[in-house]
Amino acid sequence: VFLFSGVLALIAAPVYGYYYGYGWEHALWFIITFSFCNLSITAGYHRLWAHKAYQAHSSLRFVYAIGGAFALQNSVLHWSSDHRPHHKFVDNNDKDPYSAKRGFWYSHIGWMLRNYTEDTYSDYSNCRDLQKDKIVMWQHKHYLALALITNVGIALLLGVIYGDIVGMLLIVGALRLFLSHHSTFFINSLAHIWGSQPYTTKNTARDNGLLAFFTFGEGYHNFHHIF
């Protein structure tokens, strides 16, 4: 997925744009869909479910569940199960799933390319609370279908509406997915390398205003890891 979306975003999208051009509608829907995906991860997957930082109405939780599937970062249950050990064992190479001390590329994307075993891949014992959430479990059960419908269906629908299916698939589909993925991944990698540490130096997390802007506040990572 990462390779395919990267090729389409970095090669196919610019080439298509050079020959056929893009309009205001491509830019508008890119911003809307990118924001929807990243907010669903930040406010939904991360703060609401993984950290239980606040409570939300079922309608908002449903919207976040759809947006999270659109972001293509696995289900709420799986994402939260990976993330909770990161905070509990931050920078521990043996227990932190994406420990920054194992290097930039590992914490950015390499940790997702590791060998998986069936028993550990589906072990959600650290998220028993989330298994009581009907929306979380509904999304987990239907994640693949939801991911396919949102990632292909939304771009196709917009393409039909505006008369440019290929252009919308490249911008709202591939480019949006590529940038949404890597802006999130940069929090696991770059936000543990580049930035300031005004709140704690006990771990590698850093505050980075530039990353915070593109990730709806996630770049204030030093603050997040201490509070």
Task: Describe each PLM feature range.
Residues 1-185, 190:
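Non-catalytic, topology-defining segments of multipass membrane proteins
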Residues 48, 223-224:
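Residues that scaffold the ATP/ADP-binding catalytic core of kinase and kinase-like folds
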Residues 127-135, 194-220, 226-227:
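Active-site-proximal inter-transmembrane loops
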